[in-house]
Amino acid sequence: MSSRSPDLPGAFLGAPIAHRGLHDRACGVIENSRGAIRAAIEAGYGIEIDIQPAACGEAMVFHDDTLDRLTAETGAVRERSAEALGRIALTASGGETIPTLGEILALVDGRAPLLIEIKDQDGALGPDVGPLGDRIAELLVEYAGPVAVMSFNPAALASLVEAAPRIPRGLITCDFTAEHWPRVPAERRAALAALRDLEPLGAAFISHQWRDLSSPAVLAAKAAGRAVLCWTVRSPREERIARALADNVTFEGYLAEVPEDAPGQSAPSPAPDPRPGGLGWRRRPHRQPAGPRGH
């Protein structure tokens, strides 16, 4: 059994967490972009981002394992160098390019809690995860703001036990059905759904599929003192349902309400400019591009 990671800071249990930042394609603000991160900070939200590796091992802030959905390029992210990826424009962004984790850490600079997802590199939630966790740990050594790392793949977190013992680590979890996880063996899916990796990893929290929060395994994790976040609510109604069991929500597709006493947040800036060309978050529903609806 690994030693328990530090508890999730209270900052993650206050303001709702913007899924891939506060993105709105109609305004030219793309998921996991610098603009989406800035918008989330200005609105007083926490931030969730995704990490994929470049060919050189650098940690890139990008959700998909291929470039096709969000850029004019094609092919695997891991086949391009960080330098090359940093020159690729995100579509409909007005020229924004793919950022590195180091750039996003410098941008956030402790002004909002930052939840970092390590994307699965094995393809079936197995042990072949590469050195991405080590690179993330290296980048977080000097970071002073509220930060936590999580993954669907327990193996992706294993290197952090020794490499980043002061960083809270958690598992992203769900019901792990065969329909959604066809490459994962049935026995392994059952173990993942039962949250059997929590104790061996010393995980301090989970981020669970919101529709499955009443799972006995989730209730047991909460009773054991682990924080329970959830993903991904897309309306005030879904948020109300999720909050009956979850300590906080990851959201997109609308503007979640920020509690006035939310811990760990910078004071929200005035509402962004709603004029044409400005970010009109306060004037109309937040919209997202078509894409994966998972975490």
Q: What is the meaning of each model-derived region?
A:
Residues 1-295:
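Phosphate-group recognition and catalysis centered on beta-loop-alpha active-site segments
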